Amino acid sequence: MDLGISEKVAPLLERVRSFINEQVMPVEHEFVAEIEVDDPFVLTDRQTEILGSLKNQAREAGLWNFFLTGEKGSGLNTVEYAYLAEEMGKSRLAAEVFNCSAPDTGNMEVLHKYGSEAQKKQWLEPLLAGEIRSCFGMTEPAVASSDATNICTSATLEGDEWVINGEKHWTSGAGDPRCKVMICMVKTDPEAPKHLQQSQILVPMDTPGVNIVRPLKVFNMLDAPHGHMRVKLENVRVPKDNIILGPGRGFEISQGRLGPGRIHHCMRSIGSAEKALELLCERATEREAFGRPLYKLGGNIDIIADARMNIEQARLLTLKTAWMMDHTSPKEARIWISMIKTVVPNMALKVIDDAIQMHGGIGVSQDTPLAEMWSGQRTLRLADGPDAVHRMVVGRNEIKQYLAEAGEVAATFRDG
């Protein structure tokens, strides 16, 4: 099992790291400072200029669409891409600059893997080119979304059209004017078996009946310009051919989508933790109290050591999960994905929280990125499945294995 940086990805990783440090980081603060109070989800002229210039430079340098692994994508495997995702996690803008930001990556993977040729032509091509953005409508306000089969939004076939009614919330990116299409999880057959009731349908955002109700704040922050929207769909009519893969395949598609996405999220989280540790060390060495640098006070050196050890453990677990995704079945990888989805956000939260504490009051202000980083990681404990559900998956699997092995041992003694 080789989890190291391969010869293929090593030079690419260095180029990505250099691009982020030399091109992205110097303008990131300016981009954030430009967010408009009156209309935070619309990019200002200066933000458009910054982002457009960075994306053009990245595309011309071949630093583009890394996430689409395998022969038809970047040629990277999941382990190799994981190292790039970690670097992107150190910057607020980097993932979008390289056209590797959620939810577009997951949507592009869905269209690449399951979409028809017409769907790929209409939506995948402009997404891969970075010309448009997209959103994914799954979570709903009226039901517990920790159960991925728990969908109320309905789609009824009337002639050659699907008629969609329902509400979605936490629809990330839906308020961005660049967002042109939603992949919407709907219920098409309430009488079918539980995992065959759902379908996924492409809904252009300018379709009559698609209404942005309001943005949802995260710890009273809008998370602009990306944002998370509540969306109402009232008698939304789209062509029959907008369904992806076919009726009843929605749950199957969502599982294929969420697995790689969770690995990407976790590696970016490790990048965030690395950035927080860097800021923590900077503060601990430059700031003095009682005549001594902070790292020489109390148990602060232990905090720094624990952060490094916890990051390394989480990285190794995530890389092994990426390896499982490359070399085993999705069913086998599923348990490992649940492990990292539980371990990594909680690890990152602890490191970021320790960095906040080391900074004192300024750590919770807008003068450092730490408060926003903490908010993002706390949200990730809920996004793509709450960690309580992932713990349940891991625990149940452990009991299942124990009982199977215990049964084999008992049978051996009984028969022997």
What is each of the regions a protein language model found here?
Residues 71, 139-143, 170-172, 216-220:
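Short, solvent-exposed loop/turn elements at beta->coil junctions and helix N-caps
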Residues 160-161, 165-213:
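A short core secondary-structure module
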Residues 76-78, 146-149, 174-179, 194-197, ...:
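Short glycine/proline-enriched turns and hinge-like loops at secondary-structure junctions
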Residues 1-92, 101, 114-119, 126-131, ...:
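Alpha-helical interface subdomain recognition
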Residues 150, 208-237:
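Flexible, small-/acidic-enriched active-site or ligand-binding loops
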Residues 98-118, 147:
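N-terminal glycine-rich flavin-associated loop
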Residues 130-139, 183:
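A short, Trp-centered hydrophobic/proline-enriched beta-strand micro-motif
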Residues 152-154:
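Short, surface-exposed charged micro-motifs
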